[in-house]
């Protein structure tokens, strides 16, 4: 009887990578080129901190060789040892055959230049909010700033914190603030706790397990940040294998993608200070959000790579 071929999670036969001969790949850039070719051949999806196969390949190569991504150019033509080459080929093979996000394979992702631990208990963070903290919350009379000064922010809430990366970025950005971070997932909070500890912020970032505002009592905040589940039913059905490897809970926003967003907007007024505000990421659903909440004067904030995916609303406009 013929042996059954190994299957992927989606039921297809797992792709096989041709054996690489000794000496065929020599330098870091050789392994990047080889990776890109295999990634393109396998039609991988890129949406987890990198947006193209070249950046993904460079990220994997650097992590495997214990290099910061910023160091790749300096070592691009350096030779790779035999042991390092085997490690790299194993990683490339895993990325192609498992379709897991690269960040899961190396247990790391970078946001705003800072490293964060990730594994399959959390969605791989790729929020625009970190960039917006820098561009719209600088104060000091900066054009477009939504606050007077970062030091004036005393309490921040991060809803649906996942790995805790946004809570940590907020703690760095607002030096006088304490940060509460909430998630319903026990596993996610375990990952967040590791990240908070590794960044030395245990005294300033407090983790809470619960459903949105439920564990917070009557606490009020100067700023609420959230990147909640916002994928609609149609989008959930079309997720690529890389996204299906992540926790479904972190994506699923209900039929129209707004189940969690509605609850946040409904309850946020009870947890904001009079001069506070809410910043919320909703993906590419701006038109739907505007139609669902025509009475709200939402301010849509753009970044270098996004347009109309994050909104701001002041506490006074939510009452």
UniProtKB/Swiss-Prot annotation:
Top-level enzyme category: transferase
This protein's record includes keyword S-adenosyl-L-methionine: yes
One GO molecular-function entry: protein-glutamine N-methyltransferase activity
Entry GO terms, CC: cytosol
Keywords: Methyltransferase, S-adenosyl-L-methionine, Transferase
UniProt keyword annotation of Signal present: no
GO biological process: methylation
InterPro entries: DNA_methylase_N6_adenine_CS (IPR002052), HemK-like (IPR004556), Ribosome_uL3_MTase (IPR017127), SAM-dependent_MTases_sf (IPR029063), Small_mtfrase_dom (IPR007848)
Catalytic activity, EC: 2.1.1.298
Reactions performed catalytically: L-glutaminyl-[ribosomal protein uL3] + S-adenosyl-L-methionine = N(5)-methyl-L-glutaminyl-[ribosomal protein uL3] + S-adenosyl-L-homocysteine + H(+)
Annotated function: Methylates large ribosomal subunit protein uL3 on a specific glutamine residue.
Family the UniProt entry places it in: Belongs to the protein N5-glutamine methyltransferase family. PrmB subfamily.
Protein's name in the database: Ribosomal protein uL3 glutamine methyltransferase
Originating organism: Bradyrhizobium diazoefficiens (strain JCM 10833 / BCRC 13528 / IAM 13628 / NBRC 14792 / USDA 110)
């Amino acid at each position: 009887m013929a042996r059954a071929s190994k299957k992927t999670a989606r039921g297809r036969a797992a792709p096989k990578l041709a054996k690489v001969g000794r000496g065929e790949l020599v330098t870091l850039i050789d392994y990047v080129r080889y990776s890109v070719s295999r990634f393109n051949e396998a039609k991988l999806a890129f949406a987890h901190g990198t947006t193209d196969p070249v950046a993904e390949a460079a990220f994997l190569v650097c992590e495997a060789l214990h290099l910061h991504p910023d160091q790749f150019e300096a070592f691009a033509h350096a030779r790779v040892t035999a042991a390092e080459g085997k490690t790299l080929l194993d990683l490339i093979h895993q990325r192609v055959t498992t379709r897991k996000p690269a960040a899961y394979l190396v247990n790391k992702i970078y946001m705003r230049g800072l490293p964060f631990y990730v594994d399959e208990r959390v969605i791989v963070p790729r929020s625009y909010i970190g960039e917006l903290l820098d561009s719209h919350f600088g104060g000091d009379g900066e054009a477009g700033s939504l606050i007077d000064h970062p030091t004036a922010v005393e309490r921040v809430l991060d809803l649906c914190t996942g790995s805790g990366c946004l809570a940590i970025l907020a703690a760095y950005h607002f030096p006088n603030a304490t940060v509460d971070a909430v998630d319903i997932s026990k596993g996610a909070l375990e990952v967040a706790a590791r990240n908070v500890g590794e960044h030395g912020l245990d005294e300033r970032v407090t983790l809470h397990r619960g459903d949105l505002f439920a564990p917070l009592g009557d606490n009020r905040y100067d700023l609420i940040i959230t990147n909640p589940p916002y994928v609609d039913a149609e989008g959930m059905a079309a997720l690529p294998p890389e996204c299906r490897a992540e926790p479904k809970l972190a994506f699923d926003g209900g039929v129209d993608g707004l189940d969690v967003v509605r609850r946040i907007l409904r309850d946020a007024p009870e947890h904001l200070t009079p001069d506070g505000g809410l910043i919320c990421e909703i993906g590419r659903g701006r038109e739907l959000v505007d139609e669902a909440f025509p009475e709200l004067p939402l301010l849509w904030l753009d970044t270098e790579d996004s347009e109309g995916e994050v909104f701001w609303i002041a506490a006074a406009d939510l009452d």
